[in-house]
Amino acid sequence: MGLGKTLTTIALHLHRAETAGETAGPTLVVCPASLITNWQREIARFAPDTPVLRYHGTGRTLDTDALDHTTVVITTYGTLRRDPALTATQWGLVVADEAQHIKNPASATAKALRDVPARSRLAVTGTPVENNLTELWAILDWTNPGIFGTRSAFRARYGAVEKDPNAPAAAGLARLVAPFMLRRRKTDPGIAPELPGKVHHHRIVALTDEQTGLYEAIVRDTMDKITTSSGIERRGLVLKLLQALRQINNTPTLYLKEPLDDAEPDGLARRSGKLAALDELTSTLADRGEAALVFTGYVQMGRILEHHLRVRGRSVRFLHGGTPPARRQELVDAFQHDPDPAPVFILSVKAAGTGLTLTRAEHVIHYDRPWNPAVEDQATYRAHRIGQHRTVQVHHLITEGTVEDHINDLLARKRALTDSVLASGEGALTELDNTELTALVILRKSAC
């Protein structure tokens, strides 16, 4: 979010090293692979005398005898799960960056992190609650084991807050966690007074005839199956339906799994209302000399967009989960300093929705809108963060009358409600009854 969490953590490390001396012990930072280089650079910038060891990749070695109270070791969640050397070392401070990675206490990542011996623990995240309050409990229980009781007891006591943020339990929960949380928001006085605003634009685009035919056919065929199924089978069919509709809304090329080699640029745009709208928008930005981030939830959609925009002559890059960490930083640096006046950076939401600073962009385009408001906000914050000097324009491409149009209405009308209900994304929608589900996915035709 750009509120100085990394800098605050570095300051904490320096404070411990200075006040406790050798008894402080070394600091271990565990983060997503995409953030290793960012941590190295921030430490070099603000604490240049601090020894830093990057413990990741093949050939890594950990000389515990060389670690002292001034040392910071940076590793990834993936390395932590696989490497016993990290759990065999006594750490003074363990930092879990983007701590939402441990929101599931039963996951291998959360279990591995619990096994790391440390005198102190610090969780760093911009989204302590993405889906439900159990995630908040998981993070707090890692930092302070046992203080907040069992997960089931915590949920029983405060679960009502998820459905009603104004429930009586909300005030009690706030008082309970306040001593253990340092929370900053961009709207807090003095935090980011120089940060410009952001403006949201909802671009409602029509489906093409091909998209309409595919959409209506998949709704008709799948709803027939859903109405005669139950339990796990029904939930699976609902998720499959929602994924298919989102892909059709993006472009038939994605849904039909067509090879890009055979995709003619003008043909791609003619087949997809969204792609045609993106063409128009990026052309306008190119004329103005303004850079943009384009977020998508599908890696293959990112490849389609990259192929399409490159053929259109745009300066374009694509970062996704399969991009090696070193290459990720190269892409970020290249975008931030691209001599082209209007570069486009395509990013998968899952791989790039947190941690990166991309203030070169003054436009954020959500090609397929995340149904989790917290995830969407985190992606937008890649550009709207400290260091940004221009108003950020946030564009949501929404296909008219479709399931994402219905979801957009909910997000617009009931933001507080969606934080608790829709925050779990498609999973919550599997619990709708057949009538509610039909109303959600049915294609509403325009009156004109």
Where are these regions (language model features)?
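Rossmann-like adenosine-cofactor binding region
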Residues: 167
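ASCE P-loop NTPase motor core, strongest for the SF2 helicase catalytic module
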Residues: 1-163, 175-195, 199-448
